[in-house]
Amino acid sequence: MPTATAAQPLRPFGTVLSAVVTPFTASGAVDLDAAAALAVHLVEHGHDGLVVSGTTGESPTTSDEEKDRLLRAVLDAVGDRVHVLAGVGTNDTAHTLELARAAEKAGAHGLLVVTPYYNKPPQAALAHHFTTVADGTGLPVMLYDIPGRSGVPIETETLVRVAEHERIVAVKDAKGDSWGTSWVLARTELAYYSGDDAVNLPLLAQGASGIVSVVSHVAGREYAAMVAAVDAGDLVTARAIHTRLLPAVRGIMTRTQGVVAVKAALELTGVLSGRAVRPPLLPATPEEVAALAADLALAGLAPAPLDA
């Protein structure tokens, strides 16, 4: 296995990835043409990886068949240019295995496996779940540690244990435990990817390999420049980019659900023609869109605020 260096961390899935939204038609169907066009747009704007059917892809409200068709559409559009990961995590190990095998058959380059949610497994059960899924295909696995949604963290010793599996190679970290992250980075060869746009720069400075971002839908080139600056040891430039993007992070990640806001941002910037989401989520309100437009303008990412 290759080893990281002070200048170049391990990057099994690239550096700048979006947790890609799933476009829907006005009638609520998955819009495969829009999904393919969005994938091309992201690749042309700083991304070297995409995650399909993650939380921001509204995976809890898409069927297995829809997930498969969506993944294939993205792979057909950009699979020869960037890393494409399939979100396959559920709170049912057997179902996760089914999704993982379907993703492998479709041609995915890797799997994103979130901590099982709601049933709150203890750490030994988490390790069993992750290694069982990793055993089930030949694809590399990125774990997704997000206790704010799943209810359970992946503890440091559990990460160290599962890192011994040859196909568990990365972690999407949205836990907010800088101390624990430092220990895992020191004790394993797991590649860390920031899963929280508010702490992209701190995690990169700690040695993270890259980001799996929501805000990158409208700031991919900026985040690519941030990663490059950190690689070059130019934290002054990296910090300037981080500071410039703060209003966008606020607008997309704090005023409503990230997927709701980022779909509105993609509509504001002309990338998507609508901002439909699936219930129980609701689209951004006119007031939310106006506030978001102001935040994007402050970050230099959109025109002046729209009238509500």
From Swiss-Prot:
What is this protein for, i.e. what is its function?
Answer: Catalyzes the condensation of (S)-aspartate-beta-semialdehyde [(S)-ASA] and pyruvate to 4-hydroxy-tetrahydrodipicolinate (HTPA).
Question: What is the main EC category here?
Answer: lyase
Q: Which gene encodes it?
A: dapA
Pathway(s) annotated for this protein in UniProt: Amino-acid biosynthesis; L-lysine biosynthesis via DAP pathway; (S)-tetrahydrodipicolinate from L-aspartate: step 3/4
Location of this chain's protein in the cell: Cytoplasm
Q: What is its EC number?
A: 4.3.3.7
What organism is this sequence from? Answer: Kineococcus radiotolerans (strain ATCC BAA-149 / DSM 14245 / SRS30216)
Active site residues of this protein: Y144, K172
Question: Sorted alphabetically, which SUPFAM superfamilies does this protein's record hold?
Answer: Aldolase
- Tell me which CDD domains the record gives: DHDPS
Recorded protein name is 4-hydroxy-tetrahydrodipicolinate synthase
Query: GO terms for biological process?
Result: diaminopimelate biosynthetic process; lysine biosynthetic process via diaminopimelate
* Residues reported in the UniProt entry to bind pyruvate: T56, V212
